[in-house]
Amino acid sequence: MKNLNKNFLYTFLHRWLGDGLLTSKGPMWQKRRKILTPAFHFSILLQFVDVFNRETKNFNNLIERQYLNQPIDVMPIISDFTLATMSETSMGTKVNLLTKTGLKYKSAIQELGNMIMKRSTTPWLWWQKLFDLSPLRKIEKKDLEVLHNFTTNIIVEKSRNFKTFDDHFDESVTKRKYPLMDILLNAKFRHKGIDDTAIRNEVDTFMFEGHDTVATCLGFTTMLFAVHSDFQREVYQEIVNILGTDLANKPTYANLQEMSLLERCIKESLRLYPPVPVMGRKTNDEISTKFGVIPKDVNVFIHLYDMHRNPDLWLNPDKFDPSRHLPENSQNRHTYAYIPFSAGPRNCIGQRFAMLEIKAFFCGLLRKFVLEPVDTPETLSLIQEIILRSQNGIRVKFTLRQ
């Protein structure tokens, strides 16, 4: 397989994520991908719908208690939602943001993420020796201690009485939830070539990749539903047609799979606002293209934000139009014209997980509230870092649905 290596910017993550799936390469990457694949099996995803529904209900209760009928920046509370879901599904332990330990973990993961983004946009900090002399190194060291200790303590605790299980999952697996850490511990105790450090790296990678990216999608999609009230009404009707109006009826995996309009709206949000707006690769070999030859050992960047709005690929590219993702409208589109989850062998291993979480969130949110616009695409001040962000937040108004 050619050109599977990430480019040099990903080395900034090594002290945090080690040789996790995001940063590893070659045989190591292939081995880890094989070990991790069972964690995203259909039968495992079935079990996580309960987690998504419960945390969505908690999110809705928070909105109803504190934020009704007023403009609020949704990003901080959405970030807390994804932190809760990701910690429970990856570690089997929900980060309690009301405790000192939980608050330290939340602060560290956000601070370290911001530090990496700062470094990625400051060329003189790309050199390791200069970075280590900068004040950012002190922040990195402090935050890594918090994050690594948190994950390591859970690994040690779970290892004490861990019982191995058959990892050939099928639809009958319903009794026990299998968070990512359990899948990895099972691989360790069944001697599949993974140790505690590698387990920590993979769990931390999942937290890093899944927390901010999903939160970004949820934030921008919330704004788009508020702005486009016609689609908000249509999606709400789709949900009612499947679940009825009784909020006690929680969506199942099968219910969420039926929500095709909701999925198209999410896909269109990911086109307009890809959470990871730029991806990087390093060429292993010389590549010939119609524009010329790309030499070996060159860092190549793929600008998803621009590609997803390229008028040569998309009619009226800045328009929110979920019908683009109907099968009849996308079947002739180039395979790599739309890649919010990357593409090829190194695509996002958790993309089905992410889509399920996002659909469960909006299924619960739109049944409870009407979203009214405060910010619009025109008022946002976007910044492209490792994660796409709005500098001035994303404000929405929530009113109870009658």
PLM features: what roles do these ranges have?
Residues 1-51, 55, 73-74, 78-87, ...:
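Cytochrome P450 substrate-recognition site 1
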Residues 2, 229-232, 351-388:
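Cytochrome P450 heme-binding "Cys pocket" and the immediately downstream C-terminal segment
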Residues 17, 22, 38, 209, ...:
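Cytochrome P450 heme-thiolate "Cys pocket" and heme-binding signature region
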Residues 18, 57, 72-97, 110-113, ...:
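Hydrophobic mid-domain F-helix/FG-region of cytochrome P450s
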Residues 43-54, 64-88, 96-105, 126-150, ...:
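Cytochrome P450
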